[in-house]
Amino acid sequence: MLEEKPVPKEWLASFERLMQVIDTLRSPGGCPWDQKQTVESLAPHLVEECHEMVDAVARGDMAETCEELGDLMMGILMVARVASEGRGFHPGDVATGITEKLIRRHPHVYGDVEVDGDESTVLKNWEAIKKEEKAAKGLDESALSGVPPSLPALLRAYRVGQKASNAGFDWPDLEGPEAKVDEE
């Protein structure tokens, strides 16, 4: 197992300051708009901020990427803060959950699984672990599960195509799928 490096103190201080600002905005005497927000009302803003960040990355504008990542981070932490007000989890739970998931899904780093530097083996292991997690939660394990209905149409079609390909529905020409449709 690799030795983990400490997180720079200035990073931790920045996160703490951001959480203080979010708490102030939500508190009595804070911002009326922020106080009225709900998990549901904030969700569309996260989608928009994510698209803005992706656009900045695509343009190669790192200063804008940093700013948009900040907007996205604020949105995520705001949703988690709002959820802490009686919705069952808080920002610490979010961080703990993703930390545990990353460790669990990287047994080649945090366990004794060997991948010999092979990225495809890493991805296969990731998908197998993800499938086990879903089964343990009693979630849908169908070949096309895990594609959010809220994705934009083109991205959703692409993801469904990827999942179908992984399930063996991948042909080099149109004759293959036509034969499969006729078979069904």
PLM feature segments, named:
Residues 1-68, 74-184:
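Flexible "arm" and connector segments at domain edges
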